[in-house]
């Protein structure tokens, strides 16, 4: 079931001495965070209006209404900013909101369980799907059509085609 709030950005470290912050957007268009109006914490207790934003290397430099000093900005480092899901357009064909994928069952092509989707990461070279198997370490796999050929949100599952180097791994048989 889709989350009713979607995280669209995270406040980072201060930028300068006048209250500006580094803002790490999670939207396809980084400046889209300006279009959603006030952004709130997940619990809705605090709200932030982005007054200005400009693109920097991998993030935005933003000013938030009421944040006027470096000390104010430092206190916000790490705060995640959310909007109501209803504010987002529906995803296009073949695109998904990360929040909709978290918690889905991961199965192989035969339907055998592999685990659950724990997270979607992007370390700069494309999306990575993290799967938590019933036991053992989590799997980090490329989120590509070859590895994840089927995403069925309505059925609550993703089909995973494990790459041969993972599928065939057997630590007990490893050469020493």
From Swiss-Prot:
Tell me which UniProt keywords the record has, alphabetically. Chaperone, Cytoplasm, Ribosome biogenesis, rRNA processing
InterPro entries for the chain = PRC_barrel-like_sf (IPR011033), PRC_RimM (IPR056792), RimM (IPR011961), RimM_N (IPR002676), RimM_N_sf (IPR036976), Transl_B-barrel_sf (IPR009000)
Q: Where in the cell is it found?
A: Cytoplasm
Per the record, its GO cellular-component terms are:
cytoplasm; ribosome
- Database matches in Pfam families: PRC_RimM (PF24986), RimM (PF01782)
Subunit annotation: Binds ribosomal protein uS19.
Comment block on domains: The PRC barrel domain binds ribosomal protein uS19.
Role description: An accessory protein needed during the final step in the assembly of 30S ribosomal subunit, possibly for assembly of the head region. Essential for efficient processing of 16S rRNA. May be needed both before and after RbfA during the maturation of 16S rRNA. It has affinity for free ribosomal 30S subunits but not for 70S ribosomes.
What is the name of the protein in this document?
A: Ribosome maturation factor RimM
């Amino acid at each position: 079931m889709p989350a009713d709030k979607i995280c669209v950005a995270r406040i980072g470290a201060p930028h300068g001495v006048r209250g500006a912050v580094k803002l790490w957007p999670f939207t396809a268009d980084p400046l889209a965070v300006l279009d959603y109006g006030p952004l709130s914490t997940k619990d809705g207790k605090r709200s932030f209006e982005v007054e200005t934003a400009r693109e920097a290397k991998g993030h935005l430099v933003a000013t938030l209404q009421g944040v006027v000093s470096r000390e104010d900005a430092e206190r916000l480092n790490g705060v995640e900013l959310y909007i109501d899901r209803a504010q987002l357009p529906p995803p296009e064909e073949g695109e998904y909101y990360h929040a909709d994928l978290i918690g889905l069952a991961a199965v192989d092509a035969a339907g055998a369980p592999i685990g659950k989707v724990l997270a979607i990461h992007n370390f700069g070279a494309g999306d990575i799907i993290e799967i938590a198997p019933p036991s053992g370490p989590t799997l980090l796999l490329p989120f590509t059509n070859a590895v994840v050929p089927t995403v069925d949100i309505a059925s609550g599952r993703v089909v995973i085609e494990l790459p041969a180097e993972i599928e065939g791994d057997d630590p007990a048989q490893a050469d020493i």
